Design a protein with these regions (language model features):
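Small-residue-enriched hydrophobic alpha-helices in membranes
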Residues: 1-14, 24-188, 194-227
Length: 227
């Protein structure tokens, strides 16, 4: 667990450095990630040290990824969580720089994910970023009284993003949507990830991810009238 934890922040530092200089915003983003994990004292210092190590020009990315695979016993769910953590950190400013994308492809390869699998996860994360910034499903209830046409456009955009979060096409039937939802929830269930060795500090991030999947599914069900 400690190996996984340190590697996660070191690789985050490496991704942040991909654009050249690590900006103040990226350091704030790393701090925000530490806040999401409720890291304080010694744990926070360990995360900060790891992030700094990742910024070194001679950071041994491939070696670190090999250690991550060993520490997780190659468990798909944990490796996916690790990759998605890097994607969400890279997306925290709203977009992905080409050099960040290149590093993410290296990370994906090192964890035995194909380029196609990475690109799909990038699309899912981009949709999730927009979905959350617009308030997700729960924001829908609050905006219904203001501006009907804006609301329709906003809901159409959110619905499109909800389908992307579940990685299904917008004409998918209720069975297909439910199957995709169950698969993603099974892979991202916080308790299952913990049982497989996810560091407890990362439980909050896992909960946020599963809530995101739940919100996307709830919106599709509501708009499409799926049971």
């Amino acid at each position: 667990q400690e190996e996984f934890f340190k590697a996660a922040f070191a690789v985050m530092g490496h991704v942040a450095k991909a654009k050249g200089q690590v900006t103040k915003e990226e350091i704030q983003l790393a701090s925000a990630m530490m806040d999401r994990m409720n890291l304080h004292g010694e744990q926070r210092r360990a995360a900060q040290d790891a992030f700094r190590e990742g910024k070194d020009s001679d950071f041994p990315l491939e070696d670190v990824l090999v250690r991550v695979k060993i520490s997780t016993a190659g468990r798909f769910d944990l490796l996916q969580f690790f990759l998605e953590l890097q994607i969400s950190a890279a997306f925290a400013d709203g977009s992905i720089h080409p050099s960040e994308r290149n590093v993410l492809h290296k990370i994906a390869r090192g964890l035995d994910f194909s380029s196609e699998q990475l690109e799909r996860r990038l699309q899912m994360q981009e949709a999730a970023f927009r979905f959350q910034s617009q308030g997700g499903f729960h924001g829908q209830h609050q905006g219904q009284s203001s501006g009907g046409s804006w609301q329709q456009a906003s809901q159409a955009d959110q619905l499109a993003d909800a389908y992307k979060i579940l990685d299904v096409s917008s004409d998918a039937d209720s069975k297909t949507v439910k199957r995709a939802y169950r698969k993603l929830m099974n892979e991202h269930h916080p308790d299952k990830l913990m049982a497989k060795g996810l560091p407890p500090e990362m439980m909050n991030v896992a909960k946020e991810k599963s809530q995101e999947i739940q919100n996307a599914y709830d919106l599709i069900k509501k708009v499409k009238g799926f049971k």
